[in-house]
């Protein structure tokens, strides 16, 4: 099955502590989760590793968020939208369900 949300898509968070925020998807994980830039930040206590040159301390990083808690953002309507698939010129393309425009 083709992915409805892909890397570099702009999404809006529907649920959780970051509800209503917009950001780009930086990574799609095979478990059905996404890593979104600046969303779902957690504080990780990092141990120093001098062999790798990693300094210790408390590091803020992005944790995965469930794909069902985000929706793709349609810049034409300014709202969250759903995605459909159709064939154009022999290629499978994604389109927004609200206005039938192609997802860029």
UniProtKB/Swiss-Prot annotation:
Pfam families: KOW, ribosomal_L24. The keyword Coiled coil does not apply. Keywords: Ribonucleoprotein, Ribosomal protein, RNA-binding, rRNA-binding. It comes from the Bacteria. Transmembrane segments: none annotated. One of its GO terms (molecular function) is rRNA binding. PROSITE patterns: RIBOSOMAL_L24. GO terms for cellular component: ribonucleoprotein complex; ribosome. The keyword RNA-binding applies. One of its GO terms (biological process) is translation. InterPro entries: KOW, Rib_uL2_dom2, Ribosomal_uL24, Ribosomal_uL24_CS, Ribosomal_uL24_KOW, Translation_prot_SH3-like_sf. One of two assembly initiator proteins, it binds directly to the 5'-end of the 23S rRNA, where it nucleates assembly of the 50S subunit. One of the proteins that surrounds the polypeptide exit tunnel on the outside of the subunit. Belongs to the universal ribosomal protein uL24 family. PANTHER family: MITOCHONDRIAL RIBOSOMAL PROTEIN L24. Part of the 50S ribosomal subunit. This is Large ribosomal subunit protein uL24. It comes from Shewanella baltica (strain OS155 / ATCC BAA-1091).
